[in-house]
Amino acid sequence: MHGHNRNGQAHVPRRKRRNRFVKKNGQCNVYFANLSNKSQRYMADIFTTCVDTRWRYMLMIFSAAFLVSWLFFGLLFWWIAFFHGDLEASPSVPAVGGPGGNGGESPNAPKPCIMHVNGFLGAFLFSVETQTTIGYGFRCVTEECPLAVIAVVVQSIVGCVIDSFMIGTIMAKMARPKKRAQTLLFSHHAVISVRDGKLCLMWRVGNLRKSHIVEAHVRAQLIKPYMTQEGEYLPLDQRDLNVGYDIGLDRIFLVSPIIIVHEIDEDSPLYGMGKEELESEDFEIVVILEGMVEATAMTTQARSSYLASEILWGHRFEPVVFEEKSHYKVDYSRFHKTYEVAGTPCCSARELQESKITVLPAPPPPPSAFCYENELALMSQEEEEMEEEAAAAAAVAAGLGLEAGSKEEAGIIRMLEFGSHLDLERMQAATLPLDNISYRRESRI
């Protein structure tokens, strides 16, 4: 039951706007919840986890890894020096051959495990110098403590592993084809208008770089809630929109902006949808552009989506490619602009198809029937002429007193036939109509 506002008008509650499944920038608006063993699964694939992590978090992780390793081995070196008694020695005793040393160290003085490490700060600095291979030459490990030598070897290996992992992750993250999708552009709106006599859904794609996308092809899917015949509710039912898979129109040469066309035919989910239905429908069209990056041969994918409110009925895109004197110019300031087309039908493609009444002319008679009718007419005309000639010959023969079947009668008949043929030729040359009797018989046929 609808409420009323203060003016007494009925208040119709507005339907909640549909959440995007795919955002305009291509990110999927999906949140995963209640995943069992999520941390263990992500740590099992630590490289992919680091590559997918944002830059700030990745740098924090590697910085923390370096600090932890330096602190751990610094504490280990301090512990070795402490138990060896190096920290109890006088800090003024110079190292053999070291800076400020004269090489005149007392032979009875104990030899430390790590030279010039007199506290935790010195051990930490030695750890940093060892792992980063700075090599100042002031602190060094002696052969007094094999444990300290082993610790130096282990720290060197750990440092190489961390460096390799960090460099590989950064390179993989920088070379990801996902960033190439940032220079692939989709129009802000999609349009529906008539093209080649049929309603078509169209949107525009473009490449902002001069480097090509190899084997570029497009796909489109319509996503909307769907209720099955058994009563099962599917909140995100996906249906393909044909953009020319069967004839290869889905593969494009993306040098300049191209308009992708989906013909709304009997197989299209938009076939029974008109302008009014479009404004009230709840669906989303996800468009996908895939191809290989020319520089790295890695597959990249760019995505975008259009809600029903972002589809303009009866509009077309403004042209962006213009032919100059020696080249073609692409004006990207017109990339998202459209203009309204007058006379675009507001009905659905189904209603438009049903309203087309095509009156086909009656097919002409086959050549065999035409010849047969003319043949009958000519045969009837020849029979009539032969009867008239025979009657005339009989009358002449009777007047001359000749017997039937004589040679003279046959000659007279041939003369009459010759005369009748001459008369017929004159009549055809003068394009005179046939006599009433032959015309009447022909019409009967």
Swiss-Prot record:
The keyword Zinc does not apply. It is found in: Cell membrane; Postsynaptic cell membrane; Cytoplasmic vesicle membrane. Keywords: Cell membrane, Cytoplasmic vesicle, Ion channel, Ion transport, Membrane, Postsynaptic cell membrane, Potassium, Potassium transport, Synapse, Transmembrane, Transmembrane helix, Transport, Voltage-gated channel. A motif (Selectivity filter) lies at residues 133-138. Residues 1-55, 170-445 are cytoplasmic. A motif (PDZ-binding) lies at residues 443-445. Highly expressed in the forebrain, moderately in skeletal muscle. Im olfactory bulb, specifically expressed at the postsynaptic membrane of dendritic spines of granule cells. It comes from the Eukaryota. Residues 120-131, 132-138 dip into the membrane without crossing it. Gene3D superfamilies: 1.10.287.70, G protein-activated inward rectifier potassium channel 1. One of its GO terms (cellular component) is cytoplasmic vesicle membrane. InterPro entries: Ig_E-set, IRK_C, K_chnl_inward-rec_Kir, K_chnl_inward-rec_Kir2.3, K_chnl_inward-rec_Kir_cyto, Kir_TM. It is a multi-pass membrane protein. Signal peptide: none annotated. Homomultimeric and heteromultimeric association with KCNJ2 and KCNJ12. Interacts with DLG2 and DLG4. Associates, via its PDZ-recognition domain, with a complex containing LIN7A, LIN7B, LIN7C, DLG1, CASK and APBA1. Interacts with TAX1BP3. TAX1BP3 competes with LIN7 family members for KCNJ4 binding. Belongs to the inward rectifier-type potassium channel (TC 1.A.2.1) family. KCNJ4 subfamily. Inward rectifier potassium channels are characterized by a greater tendency to allow potassium to flow into the cell rather than out of it. Their voltage dependence is regulated by the concentration of extracellular potassium; as external potassium is raised, the voltage range of the channel opening shifts to more positive voltages. The inward rectification is mainly due to the blockage of outward current by internal magnesium. Can be blocked by extracellular barium and cesium. This is Inward rectifier potassium channel 4. It comes from Mus musculus. The gene is Kcnj4.
